[in-house]
Amino acid sequence: AEIKAVFVAGRVDKDKIAISARSKAEVNVQLIMEKLGGGGHFSMAACQVEEKTVKETIDKLEEAIDQYLDERG
């Protein structure tokens, strides 16, 4: 399967995790990042999550991706 989007998450300070998202034209990462309180553009977007663990943040990201895919049909 071809990779259509990538997400990178990392701790940027003690209480903050940043997620950066990039995609090809088929996946609107802006909509996914908006579900986590962020934003951006169709193919480039980001968000910052405070006071969560990396695992909790990745779980929320996976939920947001699943919601996006369900909404797309």
In which residue ranges do the predicted regions lie?
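Gly/His-enriched, cation/cofactor- and phosphate-binding structural elements
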Residues: A1-G73
